[in-house]
Amino acid sequence: MPLLTRIRGPRDLDRLSLEQLDQLAEEIRTFLVDAVSKTGGHLGPNLGVVELTIALHRVFDSPKDRVLFDTGHQSYVHKLLTGRQDFSKLKMKGGLSGYPSQAESEHDVIENSHASTVLGWADGLAKANQVLERDDHVVAVIGDGALTGGMAWEALNNIAAAKDRPLVIVVNDNERSYAPTIGGLANHLATLRTTDGYERFLARGKDLLERTPVVGRPLYETLHGAKKGLKDFIAPQGMFEDLGLKYVGPIDGHDIEALESALARAKRFGGPVIVHCLTEKGRGYQPALQDEADRFHAVGKIHPDTGLPIASSGADWTSVFGEEMVKLGQERKDIVAITAAMLQPVGLDKFAKVFPKRVYDVGIAEQHAAVSAAGLATGGLHPVFAVYATFLNRAFDQVLMDVALHKCGVTFVLDRAGVTGTDGASHNGMWDMSILQVVPGLRLAAPRDADQVRAQLREAVDVDDAPTVVRFSKGAVGPAVPAVGRIGGMDVLREPGTDAPDVLLVSVGALAPMCLEIAGLLDKQGISATVVDPRWVKPVDEAMAPLAERHRVVVTVEDNSRVGGVGSAIAQALRDAGVDVPLRDFGIPPRFLDHASRGEVMAEIGLTAPDIARQVTGLVSKLDGRFERPTAEIDSVEPARD
């Protein structure tokens, strides 16, 4: 009988010998490869934390002790050890979340997936324990790039100030972007001490620093300069101990016995302590180890034996953007690219291969990325910062006060905009158009197809006196949606076929095919509709108000929150223009959406063609009892421009 099937909770681990624990670790890796290959998910990070998670649950008593995972995609093993072994519907409707979930288990403290936050959570929980005189332990697991985020270092600065507050910080150093990216290293480390045992750490520590991405070699050289006249090296605990934090390590993150010993020492310490664990991302799975780019950080459905993806049909939005960026880079030397530790996921890997000196990976530091982009623009370049829509939320102040206030020509490309589905509440890009509506001067484009991604990206980078945003969906991009004409700066996708149309249907971004379907359904009900794509949804096109005035009702359809979104902006523009036409906005309701497929989520919130057509039909029926049709004709439609 496999050992894994006997684990129903953390305390079941207590009965296993070290030999059995090693066997369990291998069973877990086999399980993860088999399960995640069928559903997709974060495979590489979890293969790297198997022994570490086992040791954590043997040393600490969850849920009494709080074990928190930063970038919660590292929590699959934690789920398995806390009684959740049905991965058949991972990230699917009714199945396990891809991140910690309070609804799933009392062992999940926070539902986090945005990086670098766990130390702040842990600081607050530890303070609460101290005030309420509880003897519970708080353990924060951070790594897999999360220490490149400034928020983590803000928390460390506060944590280090309380020497008597118990808090265990486990640093999962998997060689993949573990790099505390901070400035002024020479000054910060000026008081580095040398230890009596530094000779034992010389070779190992130098290797640790030199293999640390981004800052490793410069850090070593800085230390060498800062300690000129003394020894040329310092043991790796220096950067943490100089902050006032006790340090244990480095520990082999795949040696359960060594891990348990180190964690037990940290548990007894009585103050904040760092346990530094060296792990291997993708451990035990050869295809992941051979993937130098990201060690199978996140995968779709794959063949478990080879790791090759199960083919998907058609191009995706991200690759269309990435290919156009290469073309722009070849045409314009001032085009540079920025990513926040997401080079491949946002499609900038091809640009980086062609222009390695014109791409900047700043780590998980969206705030810094936005301000650095402002500096690049002020210096005469045009930066394109590609980021998931949900992660731009973290840099709003910088977009507002550094980029927009200074009228910097920066282009933000928002990938995974709208409903993303399987990654759940934290990854839906459903707030960007609402948040960005308030930014003065900012221009926002929502392309409807691949051709428009290319065209509107080019339009965006031609703007040098204001921030521009291009946002698009996740996954495969559908067929081209041709325009039949243009009114102002808006593409007309369908003409009404009558001089007195009922509905002006405003389609935003990738929802163009849905809006054309809605128009077809309305037509069957005897309701005529004009379908337009504004292309640039901020600012509202000047032609919108006179066009709306020639219809009986305006309907907006957007893959964004209804609160403060495109519909709200158009309603305000109509009011400002004195146009008194009813407007009905359809979008995402103001609530967090659970994980499921995109189609299932859209159906759940009523954002489908049949649902919208039914409601619009009802609205027009009500108007028929109260108003007469206007007789004004629509202006002639100009031919579509290429």
UniProtKB/Swiss-Prot annotation:
<dbReference type="GO" id="GO:0016114">
    <property type="term" value="P:terpenoid biosynthetic process"/>
</dbReference>
<dbReference type="Pfam" id="PF13292">
    <property type="entry name" value="DXP_synthase_N"/>
</dbReference>
<dbReference type="InterPro" id="IPR020826">
    <property type="entry name" value="Transketolase_BS"/>
</dbReference>
<dbReference type="GO" id="GO:0019288">
    <property type="term" value="P:isopentenyl diphosphate biosynthetic process, methylerythritol 4-phosphate pathway"/>
</dbReference>
<comment type="subunit">
    <text>Homodimer.</text>
</comment>
<feature type="binding site">
    <location>
        <begin position="145"/>
        <end position="146"/>
    </location>
    <ligand>
        <name>thiamine diphosphate</name>
    </ligand>
</feature>
<keyword id="KW-0784">Thiamine biosynthesis</keyword>
<dbReference type="Pfam" id="PF02779">
    <property type="entry name" value="Transket_pyr"/>
</dbReference>
<feature type="binding site">
    <location>
        <position position="285"/>
    </location>
    <ligand>
        <name>thiamine diphosphate</name>
    </ligand>
</feature>
<comment type="pathway">
    <text>Metabolic intermediate biosynthesis; 1-deoxy-D-xylulose 5-phosphate biosynthesis; 1-deoxy-D-xylulose 5-phosphate from D-glyceraldehyde 3-phosphate and pyruvate: step 1/1.</text>
</comment>
<keyword id="KW-0460">Magnesium</keyword>
<keyword id="KW-0479">Metal-binding</keyword>
<feature type="binding site">
    <location>
        <position position="366"/>
    </location>
    <ligand>
        <name>thiamine diphosphate</name>
    </ligand>
</feature>
<dbReference type="InterPro" id="IPR049557">
    <property type="entry name" value="Transketolase_CS"/>
</dbReference>
<keyword id="KW-0414">Isoprene biosynthesis</keyword>
<dbReference type="GO" id="GO:0008661">
    <property type="term" value="F:1-deoxy-D-xylulose-5-phosphate synthase activity"/>
</dbReference>
<dbReference type="GO" id="GO:0009228">
    <property type="term" value="P:thiamine biosynthetic process"/>
</dbReference>
<keyword id="KW-0786">Thiamine pyrophosphate</keyword>
<feature type="binding site">
    <location>
        <begin position="113"/>
        <end position="115"/>
    </location>
    <ligand>
        <name>thiamine diphosphate</name>
    </ligand>
</feature>
<feature type="binding site">
    <location>
        <position position="174"/>
    </location>
    <ligand>
        <name>thiamine diphosphate</name>
    </ligand>
</feature>
<dbReference type="GO" id="GO:0030976">
    <property type="term" value="F:thiamine pyrophosphate binding"/>
</dbReference>
<keyword id="KW-0808">Transferase</keyword>
<dbReference type="InterPro" id="IPR005477">
    <property type="entry name" value="Dxylulose-5-P_synthase"/>
</dbReference>
<dbReference type="GO" id="GO:0005829">
    <property type="term" value="C:cytosol"/>
</dbReference>
<feature type="binding site">
    <location>
        <position position="73"/>
    </location>
    <ligand>
        <name>thiamine diphosphate</name>
    </ligand>
</feature>
<dbReference type="InterPro" id="IPR009014">
    <property type="entry name" value="Transketo_C/PFOR_II"/>
</dbReference>
<comment type="similarity">
    <text>Belongs to the transketolase family. DXPS subfamily.</text>
</comment>
<protein>
    <recommendedName>
        <fullName>1-deoxy-D-xylulose-5-phosphate synthase 2</fullName>
        <ecNumber>2.2.1.7</ecNumber>
    </recommendedName>
</protein>
<dbReference type="GO" id="GO:0000287">
    <property type="term" value="F:magnesium ion binding"/>
</dbReference>
<comment type="function">
    <text>Catalyzes the acyloin condensation reaction between C atoms 2 and 3 of pyruvate and glyceraldehyde 3-phosphate to yield 1-deoxy-D-xylulose-5-phosphate (DXP).</text>
</comment>
<dbReference type="InterPro" id="IPR029061">
    <property type="entry name" value="THDP-binding"/>
</dbReference>
<feature type="binding site">
    <location>
        <position position="144"/>
    </location>
    <ligand>
        <name>Mg(2+)</name>
    </ligand>
</feature>
<dbReference type="InterPro" id="IPR033248">
    <property type="entry name" value="Transketolase_C"/>
</dbReference>
<dbReference type="GO" id="GO:0052865">
    <property type="term" value="P:1-deoxy-D-xylulose 5-phosphate biosynthetic process"/>
</dbReference>
<dbReference type="Pfam" id="PF02780">
    <property type="entry name" value="Transketolase_C"/>
</dbReference>
<dbReference type="InterPro" id="IPR005475">
    <property type="entry name" value="Transketolase-like_Pyr-bd"/>
</dbReference>
<feature type="binding site">
    <location>
        <position position="174"/>
    </location>
    <ligand>
        <name>Mg(2+)</name>
    </ligand>
</feature>
